[in-house]
Amino acid sequence: MNGIEWLAKELSEHGIELSDKQKEQFQTYYRLLVEWNEKMNLTSITDEHEVYLKHFYDSITPSFYYDFNQPLTICDVGAGAGFPSIPLKVVYPELKVTIVDSLNKRIQFLNHLAAELGLTQVSFVHDRAETFGKGVNRETYDVVTARAVARLTVLSELCLPLVKKGGQFIALKSSKGEEELEEAQFGISILGGVFSDSYTFDLPEDAGERQMIIIDKRRQTSKKYPRKPGTPNKSPLLEN
């Protein structure tokens, strides 16, 4: 069974039926990822089955627990080669996706990828999340996602300022999410967020444990956050 057949079968078990067009989009995504990866570091995973399992399937797992089948505005922080937002966009074409990444080479790849996949309502921004979160897009997104970018204490300060009041920040972590959540509660509260839900599950074929943490944005974030680039990582918001 090749990668796309495997993905279609696994998603079908969760009530997601891929059309022929969507299958073609994933196959093109895989081909371009491997091609571009030869000239820039997009991923350490290039084996076909591994990409379909650990990148494509893994990116779509949030939709097993959260309704993405609606015209949400999504900002994906530090998405690298487009994970999780581009696989989600392929499955749920109504999503309006913005990706912010600090490396211009990755933005070039994403622009080429979106054109080849025929995606609309996607935009790719070359910026640091700390700077982007201070600009006109602050507090405008229904959902902000981040997948394995940094510890939750840091991620909260990068992502929550972008979430509009009433929206959600969805952090996708491997194991240790609960431990990170405990450490991040203080900062989440300062930034206007409240813990809502977390889901722990295993990827197929013993490919590892995953955690999805959902934070509700209840209040506007103080204008002093996010702090200047590098500060959230150097001195995260922790209870003294």
From Swiss-Prot:
Keywords, ordered alphabetically: Cytoplasm, Methyltransferase, rRNA processing, S-adenosyl-L-methionine, Transferase
TM regions (residue ranges): none
NCBIfam families named in the record: rsmG_gidB
GO molecular function: rRNA (guanine-N7-)-methyltransferase activity
InterPro entries: rRNA_ssu_MeTfrase_G, SAM-dependent_MTases_sf
Residues holding S-adenosyl-L-methionine: 78, 83, 129-130, 147
Cell compartment(s), UniProt: Cytoplasm
Role, per record: Specifically methylates the N7 position of guanine in position 535 of 16S rRNA.
Major location (coarse): cytoplasm
Source organism of this protein record: Staphylococcus haemolyticus (strain JCSC1435)
Taxonomic lineage of the native organism: Bacteria, Bacillati, Bacillota, Bacilli, Bacillales
EC class: transferase
Region (Disordered): 218-240
Family: Belongs to the methyltransferase superfamily. RNA methyltransferase RsmG family.
The name this protein goes by in its record: Ribosomal RNA small subunit methyltransferase G
Entry EC no(s): 2.1.1.-
